[in-house]
């Protein structure tokens, strides 16, 4: 009897792959090992839980048992894979070996928590998963003042949602502007103004050096010398791929588990996708590349030839009162063609030959996003 396909992880990437495989083959044996309960949920909804007044339970689409039954998989919930033997093609769990025909790492990423001193530093919370939100939801619902460490995509989305739900929010960001790695300054400034209008305090070009207890509050001491009182401190300082298991079994790992266009790792019959994978040198923690990865990998697991081809992809910043959508590569931009109106911004990024390299649209101008995405795709094919 053929050994099953084994998937480590039960997040969006893992379950997208399961669905893809099952659309093509209803019976090939699939085993999923996960450290949590295996519940299916929509992770992007975590950006809106506070304003939507949702509990962790509200976000669950299906229990792990229901998902396993519907998709005919063997689910090992609350089960940590201790080791992978890539020569023998086995995973080791609780001292028992489980053989695989093909193995997929879908181990995701964890929220990065910067090293910070102070007696309250261990009380920092993260919101990168349903389980983390479940642990923190009562604490956050009681809190009036919340400090968000990090002004990137996750930090900005959470901050706006918390403010919309009535919390007093401060965002601390070491860069001189928000979303510094994602959008140009002329888009960041109106976003910052919108956040300020919603009552959000911004502490830019500084970081949190220490968090200590003070009476019933937490006090965050900033590197610039200022102190901010808060009831809760959330770390939204980016993600780090979960690679320890891959490293331990000898796979090639950089920021993520290194894979080629076929999602193959450095070991035979071992693959990776999702937030843990570094695809040809790129980390892509967004839904669309994961869906496309799952489609390509699903075919390969069933013996078909398939390569991942990534078109220009849209990134949506989920900030409802100032929506932003963007696509493309801004690294070689020499010129921005910008239209600014009262209803938003439409900006095209061009190289020295006036070729479209990317775009950013905001506010009501987001209606231009899909026509610009088509134009960007055509420019890439020219």
Where are these regions (language model features)?
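FAD-binding core/adjacent interface of flavoenzyme oxidoreductases
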Residues: 1-6, 62-145, 220-224, 231-236, ...
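Beta1-alpha1 glycine-rich phosphate/pyrophosphate-binding loop at the start
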Residues: 2-73, 161-182
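Mid-to-C-terminal Rossmann-like scaffold of FAD/NAD(P)H-dependent oxidoreductases
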Residues: 2-4, 10, 23, 276-371
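Glycine-rich Rossmann-fold phosphate-binding loop(s) that bind the pyrophosphate
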Residues: 9-12, 128, 149-152
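A short alpha-helix-loop-beta-strand transition element characteristic
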Residues: 29, 56-60, 67, 254, ...
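Rossmann-like dinucleotide-binding cores of NAD(P)H-dependent redox enzymes
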Residues: 60, 154-210, 290, 308-316, ...
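FAD-binding beta-loop-beta segment adjacent to the flavin cofactor pocket
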Residues: 111, 257-270, 330-347
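FAD-site-proximal beta/loop scaffold in flavoenzymes
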Residues: 120-141, 215, 219-221, 227-299
């Amino acid at each position: 009897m053929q050994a099953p396909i084994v998937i480590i992880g039960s997040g969006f990437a893992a379950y997208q792959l399961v669905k893809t495989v099952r659309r093509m083959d209803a019976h090939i044996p699939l085993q999923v090992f996960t450290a949590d309960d295996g519940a299916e949920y929509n992770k992007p909804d975590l950006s809106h839980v506070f304003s939507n007044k949702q509990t962790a339970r509200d976000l669950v689409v299906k229990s792990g048992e229901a998902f396993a039954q519907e998709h005919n998989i063997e689910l090992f919930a609350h089960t940590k894979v201790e080791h992978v033997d890539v020569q023998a093609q086995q995973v080791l769990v609780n001292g028992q070996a489980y053989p695989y025909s093909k193995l997929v790492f879908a181990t995701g990423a964890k929220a990065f928590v910067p090293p910070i001193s102070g007696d309250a530093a261990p009380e920092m919370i993260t919101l990168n998963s349903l389980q983390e939100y479940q642990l923190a939801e009562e604490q956050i619902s009681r809190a009036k003042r919340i400090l968000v460490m990090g002004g990137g995509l996750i930090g900005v989305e959470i901050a706006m949602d918390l403010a919309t739900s009535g919390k007093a929010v401060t965002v601390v960001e070491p860069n001189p502007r928000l979303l510094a790695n994602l959008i140009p300054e002329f888009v960041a400034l109106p976003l910052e103004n919108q956040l300020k209008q919603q009552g959000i305090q911004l502490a830019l070009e500084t970081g949190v050096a220490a968090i200590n207890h003070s009476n019933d509050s937490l006090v965050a001491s900033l590197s610039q010398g200022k102190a901010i009182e808060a009831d809760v401190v959330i770390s939204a300082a980016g993600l780090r791929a979960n690679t320890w298991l891959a490293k331990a079994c000898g796979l090639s790992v950089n920021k993520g588990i290194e894979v080629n266009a076929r999602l193959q790792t450095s070991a035979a019959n071992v693959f990776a996708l999702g937030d843990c994978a570094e695809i040809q040198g790129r980390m892509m923690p967004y839904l669309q590349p994961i869906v496309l990865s799952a489609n390509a990998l699903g075919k390969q697991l069933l013996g078909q030839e398939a390569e991942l081809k990534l078109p220009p992809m849209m990134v949506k910043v989920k900030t409802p009162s100032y929506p932003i959508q963007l696509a493309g590569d801004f690294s070689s931009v020499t010129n921005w063609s910008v239209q600014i109106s009262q209803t938003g911004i439409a900006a095209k990024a061009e190289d020295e030959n006036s070729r479209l390299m990317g775009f950013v649209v905001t506010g009501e101008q987001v209606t231009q996003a899909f026509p610009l995405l088509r134009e960007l795709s055509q420019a890439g094919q020219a």
